[in-house]
Amino acid sequence: MSVIPYVIEQTGRGERMYDIYSRLLKDRIIFVGTPIESQMANTIVAQLLLLDSQNPDQEIQMYINCPGGEVYAGLAIYDTMRYIKAPVSTICVGIAMSMGSVLLMAGDKGKRLALPNSRIMIHQGSAGFRGNTPDLEVQAKEVLRLRDTLIDIYHRHTNLPHEKLLRDMERDYFMSPYEAQQYGLIDSVIEHTRQPEAAL
């Protein structure tokens, strides 16, 4: 179980305490830092809708350090990012894998960024099958439909041919941020703003 840090701020009415995610939300920053599942996705969708309703012209920053997760839940976040009027910038700060990479490339054109030591990975995803033969047939069709949906989404954002995407996504396909930029998943790599101090 993770511990959520709290921030104490001085206001005109005294001290106010926020959990770190609520404080970031005040500055229109959303942090995607866990595997994607339905409850987490509902929270991210609600945050996007709130910030869009508050000011549809002001940018939302989404920081991503995500190993992936459930496809349906991830698509709910993706669709909401593309639905709202507020511009969304995405920044990878560690990993953006599987559905995490879909969210990373869903940022507005020119606003999809990654830090220099981050890693991005795309693949087809996986599904566990259980049930009798008719159920397995239905599930197999749905997995193929989801695969085609994801390939269409990657194609829309990268302009790469469907055949290349299908080939690359047959296995885990890892990229540095510079490779992801060439691939079309992101627009630029954020270089460090501070240089390390020279060793004595």
From Swiss-Prot:
It is an enzyme of class 3 (hydrolase). One of its GO terms (biological process) is protein quality control for misfolded or incompletely synthesized proteins. InterPro entries: ClpP, ClpP/crotonase-like_dom_sf, ClpP/TepA. It holds the Pfam family CLP_protease. Its EC number is 3.4.21.92. The active site is at S98, H123. The keyword Cytoplasm applies. Cleaves peptides in various proteins in a process that requires ATP hydrolysis. Has a chymotrypsin-like activity. Plays a major role in the degradation of misfolded proteins. Belongs to the peptidase S14 family. Fourteen ClpP subunits assemble into 2 heptameric rings which stack back to back to give a disk-like structure with a central cavity, resembling the structure of eukaryotic proteasomes. PANTHER family: ATP-DEPENDENT CLP PROTEASE PROTEOLYTIC SUBUNIT. This is ATP-dependent Clp protease proteolytic subunit. It comes from Deinococcus geothermalis (strain DSM 11300 / CIP 105573 / AG-3a).
